Amino acid sequence: MSSIIVIGGGAVGLSVAYHLGKRCARDVVLLERHQLTSGTSWHAAGIVGPLRATPNMTQLAMYASDCFKTLETETGLSTGYKRTGGYWLARKADRMDELQRIV
């Protein structure tokens, strides 16, 4: 019997189970009806770009990107994640503010 059950093996469910296990709970069970990350998370194509509409979402995306490296170090397994870089253009001042937030 577990004290915590996480339902859904997508990006969010896996993250919740991982962080609960690291922080406080050693008996976390994750339930997924199909294959891990086979639902909505699969359709996201693994894109974790830092540019988001709010500062909090930008911070979360940057944390997620860093987490892939941590997972490889902790597990010794490759996540397959690659930082590829990119270009962003700003035609308006508010867009420039968003870009400066991630620099």
Regions found by a protein language model. Give the residues of each.
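Short coil/turn connectors at secondary-structure junctions
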Residues: 1-2, 25-26, 84
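N-terminal transmembrane alpha-helices
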Residues: 6-7, 19, 35, 51
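A secondary-structure boundary/capping signal
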Residues: 7-10, 32, 44, 83-85
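Dinucleotide-binding Rossmann-like beta1-alpha1 core, especially the glycine-rich loop
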Residues: 46-103
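Glycine-rich nucleotide phosphate-binding loop and flanking beta-alpha elements
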Residues: 13, 37, 95
